[in-house]
Design a protein with these regions (language model features):
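PP2C/PPM-type serine/threonine phosphatase catalytic domain
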Residues: 1-225
Length: 225
């Protein structure tokens, strides 16, 4: 079917914040001209492990996905993109990097890891992968969270044990169920869908959304559109 016309306005920003000495967020955003048309590829990782270790974990995973984008994606574009092929290749990257980061951490004597949100956007489809508690939002007529937090409180909310309001103040809200480099096996969440016209996609780490509420994100959109 007909896809949406892709015109891109891209903005990326990262900040150390007020309580850390190092910035453990890493990100990359690329506009791609492929034989199947223009695409956007974005990856954001939020590392943990103290000082430089979290930064190493997040940057190494971003680099692995950048390599996929430059080396593997052009090959895939020779034929129509398939959900399962993207899923398998991304899961392989996560699996390999989970082991590499874990081994590096053991050598350094530290526990380290990183969250990840990855998005490939074409005029027909979006492909999303999520590990941990970074998020991807879709902001059109209303704001919707496309990813599901892989956290203890996220699971409790999903099971109906606590409310969204209770989750925001629960002291376990930063406890991850999944983390690249710290989990024995990582089970990424995969999401596939069709992009809508006049829509903003927001990739953000937990530090951003703990400071800025969903309501503020939505109202900011209304003030600039």
């Amino acid at each position: 079917g007909e896809g949406v016309t892709l015109n891109f306005l891209i903005s990326a920003n990262t900040d150390i914040g007020t309580t850390k000495q190092t910035n453990q967020d890493s990100l990359a955003v690329k506009i791609l001209n492929t034989v199947q048309g223009r695409m956007v590829f974005a990856v954001l990782c939020d590392g943990m492990g103290g000082l430089a270790n979290g930064e190493i974990a997040s940057a190494s995973l971003v680099h692995a996905f950048e390599s996929w984008c430059s080396q593997e994606l052009p090959k895939l574009c020779k034929a129509p993109l398939e959900d399962n092929v993207i899923r398998n290749q991304w899961e392989k990257i996560i699996d390999e990097m989970n082991q590499k980061i874990k081994v590096y951490g053991l050598k350094q004597g530290v526990r380290m890891g990183t969250t990840a949100v990855v998005m490939l956007l074409t005029d027909q489809r979006y492909y999303i992968m999520n590990v941990g508690d970074s998020r991807i939002y879709e902001l059109g007529d209303q704001l919707s969270q496309l990813t599901t937090d892989q956290t203890v409180v996220g699971r409790e909310v999903a099971l109906g044990h606590i409310t969204e309001a209770e989750a925001k103040v629960d002291e376990r809200r930063n406890v991850l169920l999944q983390c690249v480099g710290a989990s024995d096996t990582v089970y990424p969440e995969m999401i596939f869908g069709s992009p809508k016209a006049n829509t903003v996609y927001i990739l953000c780490s937990d530090g951003f959304r703990h400071e800025i509420s969903s309501e503020e994100i939505a109202s900011d959109r209304k003030s600039v559109v």
